[in-house]
Amino acid sequence: MTTNYIFVTGGVVSSLGKGIAAASLAAILEARGLKVTMMKLDPYINVDPGTMSPTQHGEVFVTEDGAETDLDLGHYERFIRTKMTKRNNFTAGRVYADVLRKERRGDYLGATIQVIPHITNAIKERVISGAAGHDIALVEVGGTVGDIESLPFMEAIRQLAVELGREHTMFMHLTLVPYLVAAGELKTKPTQHSVKELLSIGIQPDILVCRSDRVIPANERKKIALFCNVQEKAVISMKDVDSIYKIPQLIRAQGTDDLVCQRFGITAPAADLSEWEQVIYEEANPTGEVTIGMVGKYIELPDAYKSVNEALKHAGLKNRLSVTIKYIDSQDVESKGTEILEGLDAILVPGGFGDRGIEGKILAAQYARENAVPYLGICLGMQVALIDYARNVANMEGAHSSEFSKDTKFPVVGLITEWIDGDGNVEERTEKSDLGGTMRLGSQLCHLAKGSKARELYGNATVEERHRHRYEVNNNLLPQLEKAGLKISGLSADKKLVEIIEIPNHPWFVAAQFHPEFTSTPRDGHPLFEGFVKAAGENARGEFEK
């Protein structure tokens, strides 16, 4: 099979939505029956985003095989059916680390190691390997054209276009066409300069996707085509929309996928976008609304919880409910009290690290438990629910996690020192292990208890979900917690680790050690989130007994 490549770059400013644009095109191509994959090349020196601050970089998206990756891979999985792996995202840091490791082993036989050819060759090898077995691979290069960090990646994709042949490669460049109110017109000059910058490193774009707050008229598109040396039909107007799930239809209407198929000589049926039409219909026609409080510590950057945000919206679609997320700083719960949680239809505590705001999260779980408010805890959100239950129901005064209190009498949550990974191998960790790449990561099997809400929601006895944590429930204290009424409704493959807890005498209180948000999609949703949002709707309608 010959793989064709679409290299996606961005110019003018960052955060234009290269990932969304690329994923939307990928969704259309997939809807035409083609086997599509996507890749993200990140120019930063970190080996992966696993230890980067969520308030700087956004969330870390975890793949099935346990790779800690850029949040754009979450967009990819939400738009196309292909599952991402560790091969679909790599950084400059990863490439340099691999090249230096080979140099230390003597693999280069004494050669002087340089950016060209050694680094660029390593990039090309990873791109080819990650794209193997697919009809089309869309490869997104992070950053903005002109950034010094991205130059090795730009050079690598330029070389790939030469080596693979232009009949098997395309360049799609995303730019900004701003509207100046004072002048009363759109300005194309930034796009022209961005393409000029791209040309200076040997890359001629084949498709220009132009972001704007309005439709770019034909005369402006013609002007862009003339000065940027592209076909007029290859200048795609991508105006701002109220839902990212409308973008596949937006670019399909302009024949973008036809340009791709013509270039690669592919004959494929017309795109069937009926699933996306259904998503758009459900989003535009809710029958009610709910407000869900998300109590976290990274709320100044909503992208820190990107997959959770999207999963709540997906669940809203399935329940025909408009979901409003109210972001609440857990430190505010500590300082202002739980009064700020009043009026919410449901409460969600997402994952996180560190002790800042931890007591606020525990208070949020306690408030939901005591006031019959639907509660969904994810990762740390399960652990704080457990701590609250231990302290205030099981009479374990001062109970805490050993992550935050080394001398607590009741360490209901502790460091996992040994577990079985998804491949059946034994993993071991200690307090002295590195922070990066040492957590329990990736998809793991979970056994669901009979009669549990979790089993009812999933409709199966087992399920696989993705993990990212190094602390777990302390099994030594489980008997005391269960005696006090806590229900363990999910266990790991070897049945040694607690994966899900529930409170049976509560209308809807479920908390999971794993991250269900990573497998939610707009077309399919996710059972836990669907059940949670449904419960929020029932609470909003006054159907819960307080």
Curated annotation (Swiss-Prot):
<feature type="domain" description="Glutamine amidotransferase type-1">
    <location>
        <begin position="291"/>
        <end position="542"/>
    </location>
</feature>
<dbReference type="GO" id="GO:0019856">
    <property type="term" value="P:pyrimidine nucleobase biosynthetic process"/>
</dbReference>
<comment type="similarity">
    <text>Belongs to the CTP synthase family.</text>
</comment>
<feature type="binding site">
    <location>
        <position position="72"/>
    </location>
    <ligand>
        <name>Mg(2+)</name>
    </ligand>
</feature>
<feature type="binding site">
    <location>
        <begin position="147"/>
        <end position="149"/>
    </location>
    <ligand>
        <name>CTP</name>
    </ligand>
</feature>
<feature type="binding site">
    <location>
        <position position="352"/>
    </location>
    <ligand>
        <name>L-glutamine</name>
    </ligand>
</feature>
<dbReference type="GO" id="GO:0044210">
    <property type="term" value="P:'de novo' CTP biosynthetic process"/>
</dbReference>
<feature type="binding site">
    <location>
        <position position="470"/>
    </location>
    <ligand>
        <name>L-glutamine</name>
    </ligand>
</feature>
<dbReference type="InterPro" id="IPR027417">
    <property type="entry name" value="P-loop_NTPase"/>
</dbReference>
<dbReference type="InterPro" id="IPR017456">
    <property type="entry name" value="CTP_synthase_N"/>
</dbReference>
<dbReference type="GO" id="GO:0005524">
    <property type="term" value="F:ATP binding"/>
</dbReference>
<comment type="function">
    <text>Catalyzes the ATP-dependent amination of UTP to CTP with either L-glutamine or ammonia as the source of nitrogen. Regulates intracellular CTP levels through interactions with the four ribonucleotide triphosphates.</text>
</comment>
<feature type="binding site">
    <location>
        <position position="403"/>
    </location>
    <ligand>
        <name>L-glutamine</name>
    </ligand>
</feature>
<dbReference type="GO" id="GO:0004359">
    <property type="term" value="F:glutaminase activity"/>
</dbReference>
<feature type="binding site">
    <location>
        <begin position="239"/>
        <end position="241"/>
    </location>
    <ligand>
        <name>ATP</name>
    </ligand>
</feature>
<feature type="active site">
    <location>
        <position position="517"/>
    </location>
</feature>
<feature type="binding site">
    <location>
        <position position="223"/>
    </location>
    <ligand>
        <name>UTP</name>
    </ligand>
</feature>
<feature type="binding site">
    <location>
        <position position="223"/>
    </location>
    <ligand>
        <name>CTP</name>
    </ligand>
</feature>
<feature type="region of interest" description="Amidoligase domain">
    <location>
        <begin position="1"/>
        <end position="266"/>
    </location>
</feature>
<dbReference type="GO" id="GO:0005829">
    <property type="term" value="C:cytosol"/>
</dbReference>
<dbReference type="GO" id="GO:0042802">
    <property type="term" value="F:identical protein binding"/>
</dbReference>
<dbReference type="Pfam" id="PF06418">
    <property type="entry name" value="CTP_synth_N"/>
</dbReference>
<feature type="binding site">
    <location>
        <begin position="380"/>
        <end position="383"/>
    </location>
    <ligand>
        <name>L-glutamine</name>
    </ligand>
</feature>
<dbReference type="InterPro" id="IPR017926">
    <property type="entry name" value="GATASE"/>
</dbReference>
<feature type="binding site">
    <location>
        <position position="14"/>
    </location>
    <ligand>
        <name>UTP</name>
    </ligand>
</feature>
<keyword id="KW-0547">Nucleotide-binding</keyword>
<dbReference type="InterPro" id="IPR033828">
    <property type="entry name" value="GATase1_CTP_Synthase"/>
</dbReference>
<comment type="subunit">
    <text>Homotetramer.</text>
</comment>
<feature type="binding site">
    <location>
        <position position="72"/>
    </location>
    <ligand>
        <name>ATP</name>
    </ligand>
</feature>
<feature type="active site" description="Nucleophile; for glutamine hydrolysis">
    <location>
        <position position="379"/>
    </location>
</feature>
<feature type="binding site">
    <location>
        <position position="14"/>
    </location>
    <ligand>
        <name>CTP</name>
    </ligand>
</feature>
<feature type="binding site">
    <location>
        <position position="140"/>
    </location>
    <ligand>
        <name>Mg(2+)</name>
    </ligand>
</feature>
<dbReference type="GO" id="GO:0046872">
    <property type="term" value="F:metal ion binding"/>
</dbReference>
<dbReference type="Pfam" id="PF00117">
    <property type="entry name" value="GATase"/>
</dbReference>
<keyword id="KW-0460">Magnesium</keyword>
<feature type="binding site">
    <location>
        <begin position="15"/>
        <end position="20"/>
    </location>
    <ligand>
        <name>ATP</name>
    </ligand>
</feature>
<feature type="binding site">
    <location>
        <begin position="187"/>
        <end position="192"/>
    </location>
    <ligand>
        <name>CTP</name>
    </ligand>
</feature>
<dbReference type="InterPro" id="IPR004468">
    <property type="entry name" value="CTP_synthase"/>
</dbReference>
<keyword id="KW-0067">ATP-binding</keyword>
<feature type="binding site">
    <location>
        <begin position="187"/>
        <end position="192"/>
    </location>
    <ligand>
        <name>UTP</name>
    </ligand>
</feature>
<keyword id="KW-0479">Metal-binding</keyword>
<keyword id="KW-0436">Ligase</keyword>
